[in-house]
């Protein structure tokens, strides 16, 4: 489990920052939002397991968002990090910890990503406005999920990336619509108990994002399906492939390691804020659907 695997890490304390020097973060890509979060991810080199860490000593004292540092991002990094930022918006908005404060940031960041990521991908070396809007979206999404946390898509992406050496943003891109379908079912088993959170309204939450990003439809179900299609179209526009298999992950190796990957994803710290409680069998099926490109609700 994570608790056993991270025993040595949990015994250590992060040094108190800011007494001798400020922790200043200057991002050079638009995706992780790390310049605005108290999170880090480390990999155990012996086991290959990725672990997310959370501590306010990891939160920078200052973030400098300067588009000049982002103009030379290659297309692959632009697309992967951009969809990573979109995943931050979607998971923060659906999170059981979401609030009015995080919702506004997630909504505006998501709309910027849909509008400006294709431009940043196509003409990123010269389109300063697109780079600026993506830089802002990344930081805004970072602030949103720093306070609302994420969900099981990131849990699964952490382990998929570690087991099969896929970039983190690509892993999120391959999984996000499968997780959205999983979360948006009627009457899902809720993850946590909070006074402001009686039961999940995840379909309605996704539809709110969809409407803010220009999606219309006769009812929530139609709007949700159109939103899924809009996300898939964005991914295609920025050169992201459709399935895990398309990225050259060997089928036998994937299946052989699937159970271990599933167990570690369930134990990941991001799982706890997901709006629907996932069984390990359901995580496993979402991995399989993402590998083979099966668009079915788990």
Q: Which residues does each PLM region occupy?
A:
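Carboxylate- and glycine-rich phosphate/diphosphate-binding segment that chelates Mg2+/Mn2+
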Residues: 37-148
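Glycine-rich phosphate/pyrophosphate-binding beta-alpha loops
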Residues: 31, 139-172, 267-272
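Predominant activation on well-ordered alpha-helical scaffold segments within soluble catalytic domains
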Residues: 62, 83-91, 107-118, 135-139, ...
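Single conserved hydrophobic/aromatic residue that forms the stacking wall/gate
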Residues: 1-10
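Flexible, glycine/charged-enriched surface loops at secondary-structure junctions
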Residues: 97-105, 121-133, 148-153, 191, ...
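Short, amphipathic C-terminal "tail helix"
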Residues: 253-298
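Gly/Pro-rich interdomain helix-loop hinge
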Residues: 170-253, 296
């Amino acid at each position: 489990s994570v608790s056993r695997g991270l025993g040595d890490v949990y015994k250590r304390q992060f040094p108190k920052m800011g007494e001798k020097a400020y922790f200043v973060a200057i991002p050079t890509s638009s995706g992780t939002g790390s310049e605005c979060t108290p999170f880090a991810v480390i990999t155990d080199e012996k086991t290959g397991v990725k672990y997310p860490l959370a501590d306010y000593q990891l939160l920078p004292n200052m973030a400098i968002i300067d588009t000049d540092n982002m103009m030379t991002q290659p297309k692959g990094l632009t697309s992967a990090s951009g969809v990573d930022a979109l995943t931050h918006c979607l998971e923060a908005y659906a999170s059981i910890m979401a609030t009015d404060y995080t919702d506004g940031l997630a909504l505006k960041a998501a709309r910027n990503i849909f509008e400006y990521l294709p431009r940043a991908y196509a003409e990123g070396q010269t389109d300063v406005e697109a780079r600026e809007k993506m830089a802002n979206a990344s930081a805004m999404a970072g602030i949103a999920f720093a306070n609302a946390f994420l969900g099981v898509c990131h849990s699964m992406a952490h382990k998929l990336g570690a087991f099969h050496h896929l970039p983190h943003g690509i892993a999120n891109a391959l999984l996000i619509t499968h997780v959205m379908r999983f979360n948006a079912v009627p009457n899902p088993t809720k993850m946590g108990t909070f006074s402001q959170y009686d039961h999940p309204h995840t379909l309605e939450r996704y539809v709110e994002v969809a409407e803010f990003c220009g999606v219309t439809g006769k009812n929530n179900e139609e709007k949700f399906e159109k939103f899924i299609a809009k996300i898939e179209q964005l991914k295609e526009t920025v050169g992201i492939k459709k399935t895990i298999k398309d990225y050259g992950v060997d089928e036998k190796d994937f299946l052989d390691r699937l159970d271990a990957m599933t167990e570690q994803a369930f134990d990941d710290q991001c799982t706890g804020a997901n709006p629907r409680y996932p069984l390990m069998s359901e995580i496993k099926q979402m991995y399989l659907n993402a590998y083979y490109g099966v668009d079915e609700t788990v």
